[in-house]
């Protein structure tokens, strides 16, 4: 049974001091690594701390592949609308779509954005570091998506959208179930397609050379001067959660520095295609992806902390909005959100084997790609952006890199992103 608590009916204002204090006070739950109960969820302050428009409501959906899923929802008032499904990345939340949802709803769509498994107010997943990886592998995350669509009474989705870590979930959903997910917008993280099984080897074809693993890349990065390391390897470690949750600069300032570092406002972001996945080439990438070996992620974000005048005048991410992320992650910690790094195909043989089941398949529904021109996520894995456009997506109709945006493109340039989505939906979004 789906239950809701509409935001429009909430009228509570939070000061920054309240937000920060609340985050600190609630962080004990994360420390205990204890699963939040549904009763505890419904007693929490309203989602978004008053920073979300009245046309968006917050709602809990039970019995979704073992989860109680928290969603933001817009355009729900009118029955029979086509569904648009938005998947966030890391370290984000359903909240990251707050600027996009009202525009799509005003155009006549029913728009949903869940807190993904491991994030925010969605519960039912194991919050411990030792959690069974199966619950966070891509096929189970795809089942989460299908289960939510069905729970809402739909058989198809006009457009699924995935940003950052949400991009592979959206991509695999569209590849595996094109009957449900009728078109896709991939954002910031290009889709490489399924890993290939060896072909024609019985007739003399050579086995393909295996790609360099993250561990092999890390070993080469460590030889550089100064030594470096790949961020995904760091994020798989047990200490990654505490590093960010208890950042010396405070959780609020961690988010401010991290979001700024990967945005177009940080002038050191000048992404371009790399020749190969070698240490020398990868060393061109900023420290948030190819970190200094002796620095944590919290220290990496601290090195990019913007000045006070920038913070006071930042329109795309206000202090109150940063406070929403700090409050939610202060309550949950990062462990669940980090589990995806541990079961990505490059580091997890079980995931690799599962994905090879789909060797030779492509996304065959209409697709487009959107990213900021200042987003290194497009090129951090050499060759993938090109492969997405030639083989991984058979109906790629647009590859868009937007001025004035870095990694957080839907928050930095929501008007441009919404315009591209609506144009795409008008042409291809027939559920």
Regions found by a protein language model. Name each.
Residues 5-26:
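N-terminal secretory signal peptides and thylakoid transit peptides that target proteins
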Residues 64-66:
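Glycine-centered tight beta-turn/hairpin loop motif at sheet-sheet or coil-to-beta transitions
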Residues 72-125, 163:
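Conserved HGGG/HGGXW glycine-rich cap/lid loop of the alpha/beta-hydrolase fold
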């Amino acid at each position: 049974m789906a239950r809701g608590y509409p935001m429009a009916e909430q009228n509570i204002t939070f000061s920054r001091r309240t937000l920060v204090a609340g985050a600190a006070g609630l962080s004990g739950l994360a420390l205990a690594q204890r699963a939040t109960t549904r009763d505890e969820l419904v007693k929490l302050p309203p989602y978004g701390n008053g920073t979300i428009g009245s046309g968006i409501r917050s709602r809990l959906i039970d019995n979704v592949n073992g989860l109680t899923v928290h969603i933001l929802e817009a355009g729900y008032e009118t029955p029979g609308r086509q569904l648009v499904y938005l998947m966030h990345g890391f370290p984000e939340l359903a909240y990251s779509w707050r600027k996009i949802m009202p525009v799509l709803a005003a155009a006549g769509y029913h728009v949903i954005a869940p807190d993904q498994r491991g994030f925010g107010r969605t519960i039912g997943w194991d919050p411990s570091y030792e959690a069974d990886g199966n619950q966070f592998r891509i096929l189970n995350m795809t089942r989460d998506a299908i289960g939510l669509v069905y729970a809402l009474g739909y058989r198809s989705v006009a457009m699924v959208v995935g940003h950052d870590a949400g991009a592979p979930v959206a991509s695999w959903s569209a590849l595996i179930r094109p009957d449900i997910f009728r078109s896709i917008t991939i954002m910031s993280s290009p889709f490489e397609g399924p890993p290939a099984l060896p072909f024609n080897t019985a007739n003399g074809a050579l086995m393909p050379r295996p790609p360099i693993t993250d561990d092999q890349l890390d070993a080469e990065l460590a030889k550089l001067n100064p030594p470096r390391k790949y961020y995904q390897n760091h994020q798989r470690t047990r200490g990654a959660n505490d590093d960010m949750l208890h950042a010396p600069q405070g959780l609020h300032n961690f988010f401010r520095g991290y979001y700024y570092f990967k945005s177009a406002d940080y002038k050191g972001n000048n992404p371009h295609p790399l020749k190969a996945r070698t240490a020398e080439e990868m060393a061109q990438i900023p420290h948030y992806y190819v970190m200094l070996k002796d620095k944590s992620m919290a220290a990496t974000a601290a090195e990019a902390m913007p000045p006070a005048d920038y913070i006071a005048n930042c329109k795309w991410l206000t202090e109150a909005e940063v406070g929403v992320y700090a409050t939610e992650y202060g309550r949950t910690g990062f462990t669940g959100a980090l589990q995806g790094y541990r079961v990505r195909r490059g580091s997890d043989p079980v995931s690799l084997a599962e994905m090879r089941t789909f060797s030779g398949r492509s996304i065959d529904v209409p697709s487009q790609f959107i990213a900021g021109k200042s987003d290194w996520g497009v090129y951090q894995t050499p060759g993938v952006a090109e492969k997405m456009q030639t083989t991984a997506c058979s109906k790629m109709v647009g590859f868009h890199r937007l001025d004035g945006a870095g990694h957080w493109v839907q928050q930095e340039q929501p008007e441009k992103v919404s315009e591209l989505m609506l144009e795409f939906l008008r042409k291809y979004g027939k559920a």
